[in-house]
């Protein structure tokens, strides 16, 4: 729902920064817990601090509800400037679409597959990078874990930078740029030049992942229509979670029964 709200009412810049904040939060949580544990406090103290932050954020959201209601969609803004069709005021609210109706929309199946594959790549890279670096490249477990964390840092920093790049480039160009960087990063990992090269490849893959997710979501109302965007974004998220949950374990089976060296080929 939040993705659809932003896609309809804000620019691609805001969508990129919204998802950048996901990376900030995902990084801050373990950091807070690490500080708590290193200070000798019990683990539930860390959860208490995070819970306090959640309560504060919830209060801010509740207090800001009037601002959310007053924000116009792109269509509403055009109407207020006199650019809407004459019968736009009589347009009925969009009815909920069934899965069959959604998949019948031209391009819906393709975007579902896109989200499945993208999230499969992102989650597999994030979960298995450290194991690949340790078992295949011979890097120590501590260093491998640090290197793997740079993948998510690459996504977070990349989405922050993407917010500025979207001021100049449209969603389609940003998605293409991201895919090119992902391919370049995976090919870099494949180079037999040692752990530092694999590290560089992981960071490049992370930077490439940065614009894909937010820009595909933001382009949904434009590609499929504002009346269908909520339904399309819903199935996109479902496809994303299926890819996230299913494909990393599949690679785990391959790594266990064949070889962990298949990691970059699996990402391709």
Language-model segments: which ranges?
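Cytoplasmic helix-loop-helix junction between adjacent transmembrane helices
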Residues: 1-21
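Helix-to-loop junctions at the C-terminal end of transmembrane segments
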Residues: 158-171, 255-256
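Symmetry-related core transmembrane helices of the 12-TM Major Facilitator Superfamily/SLC fold
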Residues: 45-66, 262-268
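C-terminal transmembrane helical hairpin of 12-TM major facilitator-type secondary transporters
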Residues: 169-216
